[in-house]
Amino acid sequence: MASNVDKFSSRFYLNVNKEELKKEYVGKTIQQVPTPGFVIDEAIFEKNCNRMLDRASDIGVTFRAHVKTHKTIEGTLLQLGDGRTKAVVVSTLMEGFSLIPLILEGKIDDLLYGLPVAKSRLPELYELSKIVPHLRLMIDNPKQLDILREFTSTLPDDAKPWSIFVKIDMGTHRAGVTNDSQVVKDLISTILSDKSLFDLFGFYCHAGHSYASRSIDAASEFLCAEIDAANTAAKFATSIDPSLKLTLSVGATPTAHSVSPKVKELLPTLSGKLEVHAGNYPMNDVQQMITKCISQADVADYVFAEVISNYPGRNGEPGEVLVNAGVIAMSRETSPEGDFGIVITPGFESFYVDRLSQEHGILKSKDPKATLPDASQVLCIIPNHSCITAAAFPWYYITKGSDVITDIWVPWKGW
């Protein structure tokens, strides 16, 4: 018997092709395509990008766009704002290499690889450094300098020095060195002692713990702490070499949202040029809503899933709902309330993702009088962490202010 399986959406997973996907889906509504899927409202995405660029320019600082949330050419172009910035951060080399078309067009001229260097990836970083005018590396351990020195000894004599951001840990306790440690002083001194090999570009701070903010004012306090930490390191560096022209790069999406004119007052006191960086802000998610730095109207993305069963009265009223989006589609990131995402479909806003298995989720309602959605109902769910949720999907359905699909974005995969 002849099979027609190649007419279904599963065929696109084997060879994700933007143009073929557009032919299949553009013009359809979200209710007309297979579930689960990931949607980005391009109008909100662009508005968020422009607002962030405006914040930076209004106070006279530069902006560096982190592309790791969406991992697409289309999203990156919106973050760059038609030449308003040419500086980016990437979390993977796949992101870096995928941006080469924009580098060759002159739209990107400054690229930071946002992890401390790994020895196994240095050959790729070196090749990338030949393409982008300014490749920046992140350093937070003396061993990384040894690795760079060893690798550079294998390169041609005319290899340019490595441009370096020293990562400062100002409370998040992921990567970075603290200003009260001897390590940071040794790192700076070592970098400055060999200018044929290293070029100290500046200091980088990321207040990941600013997601604990519950107001713009609270986020602003974290931003000031980021600036102070970067400036403390810069003051030590300039005490060794007063001629240094340093960049102080600070930001997380909550702190970047809190950039205000009062930051401008700090600029003359700093031992370097201030740069703001952020990545989640074009899309946003539940965790950003909880900071109170944005509203639901600023969230550009959601997962759409389909009700496949419901269970009236189970585990309390009104019961529970089974949808075809689980851990892989939603991620295991929880909100402070313990849920995994919130439903925004009109009529079902009281529902939230209560628990997850690999490929299905269980929804509950905060309202015991709510009506359970029936099987086949499509629900839109804002994820807790859009960066991780988006990474699960092979393509994104793009809309502009409605549920009609206007484009397809295909994200880069791998490391």
From Swiss-Prot:
Q: Which residues bind pyridoxal 5'-phosphate?
A: Y204, Y211, T253, G279, N280
| GO CC aspect terms | cytosol; nucleus
Q: Please state the protein's primary subcellular location.
A: cytoplasm
In the record, biological process GO terms are: D-serine catabolic process; response to toxic substance
Is Transcription given among the entry's keywords? no
Which reaction equation describes what this protein catalyses?
A: D-serine = pyruvate + NH4(+)
> So what does this one do?
Catalyzes the conversion of D-serine to pyruvate and ammonia. May play a role in D-serine detoxification.
User: What is the protein's given name?
Assistant: D-serine dehydratase
